Amino acid sequence: MGDIRQSLLPRDVLSAAKELLYHLDIYISNLVQSGRQPPQVDTKTLELVEEFILHAPKDRNALTRRMSALQELQLLEIMCSCFQEQSRDNVRQLMFSALFSLQGNQADDSRMALLGKLVSMAVAVSRVPILECAANWLQRTHCVYCVRLAQVLVDDYCSMMPGSVPTLQNIHSASPRFCCQFITAVTTLYDLTSEELTPPLELLQMIVSWIQEDPRLVLVTFLNTPLSGSPPSTSLDVTPLGGLVRWCVKAPLVYKRDKKQMLPHSSSGSEQEVAALFSALHLSVLQVFMLLPNILNEKGIFGRLALLQVESLASLTSDLSRLLDQADKHTHTPAADVHVHPQLALDRLAQALQVAMANGALLCSREDLRAICSRLPHNNFWDIFLRRLLQEGSDGT
């Protein structure tokens, strides 16, 4: 495709981008039809994408071509139509990869900006092919960039235009694969370490309703992922279970750190409403764990593949220990709440560990479990639970 550059240069920015998309579709269709395995887009084509769609200058002395806001909107509409009209999924996926796979160069910022706008538009107009392509992108891209994409959607649909939350909620039925990856990304983004990293109430309500309606939703990526090898450590987790457990365990303490910051992202809602949402979420997560034995046995991997990682739990217990120390120092906490919220956090962690281990989601030796739990302060209930769990696991380790 390198020979079409000269024909694109005289065109205006929108016309050039549209023409390149047309040729890119033909080029990739022919590439797939040739049967070459794996089909790979050549470097010159990627450079054309960067120059005429992402508008990264080919060299330092070249003038940077820019689109107006209207032209950019028109380009997004053209891209939506292009993916919608292409009937072959493998062509769509390869085309999406040519446009948005990160290359480790200066064009990546433009790539991410355009991707965020395209996916946000796809959510708004329910362009399922783009959401499916974005689900694959989220599965193979470094989690730092996945979180950036999730942040765009939360900002667009939960912050800047709260009334449009129902539009985002529809991704559950439009593309369960994308919805599952989105949940994993937002639980990675909002780790409850600060006010800014506490999920907005609207987002929390949406995720709870999704999982209550369909607990298997959080397993969609796992169920559709080949078991040929482990994903890179820099990728998102294969399920959002670790992030959801983190939310449920830390929530009683995080939302009590400062009553003035009870609902940092929302103008409505109450302490009781938030508590009820996290309680419902915790129950749903336990129900997901209880679905796993049949699923893992069907795949022949029960006891061989952990969906809840020991490293993630170690990080959680470290955070929880810090939060418990902070809770002890809060002088304005009502006396009745001094032990209630720490106890609730510990109870949820104990329940999650127990149910996860019993149902094959967590593969953990007694030594690992003891090391994880040693970070936590002494607590009668926790000590009893730990002794029982270690005793139950003694025959299998």
Feature map (PLM): residue ranges:
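Generic L/I/V-rich hydrophobic alpha-helical segments across diverse proteins
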Residues: 21, 118, 346, 369, ...
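Polar low-complexity intrinsically disordered regions enriched in Ser/Thr and small residues
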Residues: 38, 62, 278, 303-306, ...
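Hydrophobic alpha-helical segments
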Residues: 53, 291, 330, 352-359, ...
